[in-house]
Amino acid sequence: MSASVFNRCWSKVILETLSRQGVSHFCIAPGSRSTPLTLEAIRLQENGRGTCHAHFDERSLGFFALGIAKASKKPVAVIVTSGTATANLYPAIIEARQTDVPLIILTADRPPELLECGANQAILQQNMFAQYPIASINLPRPSQNYSAQWLISVLDQACFRQKQGGVIHINVPFAEPLYNANNDEIDLHPWLSNIQSWLTQNKNWIQHQEQHTEVITHKYWDQWRTKKGIIIVGRLPSEQAMGIAEWADNMGWIMITDIQSHVKPTLPYADIWLANQTVRKKLLQAEIVIQFGSGFIGKRINQFLAEFKGEYWIIENNQKAVDPYHHAHTRFNAKPHHWLRAHPPMRKKPWLLEPLALAKFCADFIKQRVGSNLNEASLAHNIELLLPKSNSVLFLGNSLFVRLADALSQPSANYPIYTNRGASGIDGLLATAAGIAVGSEQTLVAMIGDTSTLYDLNSFALFKQLNQPAIIFVINNNGGAIFDMLPVDIAVKEKYYRMSHYLEFSHIAAMFDLKYARPYTWADLATVLKQAYSRRETTVIEIKVNPNDGSNIYKDLIDKIGHALIGV
């Protein structure tokens, strides 16, 4: 029997196993060595059991898969050939690991006899992603010496470990030949005879029974709930954010939220008003802080957490450490709604009124300071006006704009907001946004900086695969305006940090056959958005702003609010 047939049998078992573990999207980069895996993924698609996506750039492909997995909340498989194609996936793997997004990376490899001997496109791929995967499976070359049952079991066990997210790396060496295998030869191969019954059923080989761990009420909760408390809410999936705001309100406790929290802020603009030292000192009088989620964007929220010395509780539904300030704390590995149910509130009046007064003052002051012109700060402040009321998702890129949005906006509760704030890189943001559109099957609005866009231009090609409206805002402040915040010499800052490019994006949109608009006023933007939302295609909207406007407004707001005298 030809090696090409058995390579396909081996690949069939791998992909059938992953399909039963919830994988329905296969992101494929072109390459010869990965042919057995690619052809079996295509077979699943032809049988209505999966969707294949192809892209020529592995780095973008990895982030595209990341976006699909974020939005669908299901594992996504990535298939690449051997060599440096595999290394290009590393940034997306890092981001997935940092944010517990389930990716399954399938790297085709040369067989062992072709490694370390000068063979073409052969690098050391085993365990190449170090500690970032939760499981690294280095398969042997396909051989009938290993049973199909063994192969399924190895993969099933790894997928069980992935139930709380993370990356699985499966390295699959194939010897030639790789082509000309007949489907009947594959399906009737005797090696598959012991799993024929399983192949006809849509169930996992190993049936894991779910274990429901009840959250135990803290033994001193009756005492702690009478104290002065603060709720801090970081990055949370929307389904885990329900009930937190009502619970905090009943307790009369201060609640500070991140834009990634999916919780409607009762005290918006926290990253601005926390600059006020008078109010911050009063907040530090709290006796307990309870943290839901993690990954806070705002600098002043992080500074407050670093200063706080009282009782500290963290509710996080995984085993990771999420306290960069190393408080002595109580940790609950639980979903927020389970924890809330086990810790009923005690209705009380608010213990501190100054934050409410300061938040109201901020609202008026911010509106006045950002003005009516179309700029970074006004976009962030009015972001809710740009979004459809339903059936849509928002993706925020990194650098300056995500900080402005976190500090100046008031998003609706449970509006789906996605970010790449695990490692907070500017790579792969367009690709991630495209993946989120695919995974959510909803209208996409993405806000991405100019430097980030230049970093990921190849990913514009992915938007041609979409079948729904997608709006990509490119915020063009002529380089890295986030670095205006740094205390660096102006000439050095311009050359080595900001790196002004003096580019605009109309020709790039045209190259990828995407719609393009450059509005100058809010009225222009309203017209552009109305047209863009009516089309089942992608529109690039370039917002060209003065380089320093966003950072200057941000710094000015922090300075003015920081010194404001607020009475209640």
Swiss-Prot record:
Q: What is its biological role?
A: Catalyzes the thiamine diphosphate-dependent decarboxylation of 2-oxoglutarate and the subsequent addition of the resulting succinic semialdehyde-thiamine pyrophosphate anion to isochorismate to yield 2-succinyl-5-enolpyruvyl-6-hydroxy-3-cyclohexene-1-carboxylate (SEPHCHC).
Q: What is this protein called?
A: 2-succinyl-5-enolpyruvyl-6-hydroxy-3-cyclohexene-1-carboxylate synthase
Indicate the enzyme's highest-level EC class. Answer: transferase
Residue ranges spanning the membrane: these are none
Q: Which cofactor does it need?
A: Mg(2+); Mn(2+); thiamine diphosphate
Q: In which pathway does it act?
A: Quinol/quinone metabolism; 1,4-dihydroxy-2-naphthoate biosynthesis; 1,4-dihydroxy-2-naphthoate from chorismate: step 2/7; Quinol/quinone metabolism; menaquinone biosynthesis
Q: What is its EC number?
A: 2.2.1.9
* Reaction equation(s) it catalyzes: isochorismate + 2-oxoglutarate + H(+) = 5-enolpyruvoyl-6-hydroxy-2-succinyl-cyclohex-3-ene-1-carboxylate + CO2
A single GO molecular-function term is:
2-succinyl-5-enolpyruvyl-6-hydroxy-3-cyclohexene-1-carboxylic-acid synthase activity
**What is the organism field in this record?**
Histophilus somni (strain 129Pt) (Haemophilus somnus)
| Cofactor note (record) | Binds 1 thiamine pyrophosphate per subunit.
Q: Which domain of life is it from?
A: Bacteria
- Point out the signal peptide segment: none
Task: Name the GO terms of the biological process aspect.
Answer: menaquinone biosynthetic process
Pfam families (alphabetical): TPP_enzyme_C, TPP_enzyme_M_2, TPP_enzyme_N
The protein's gene is named: menD
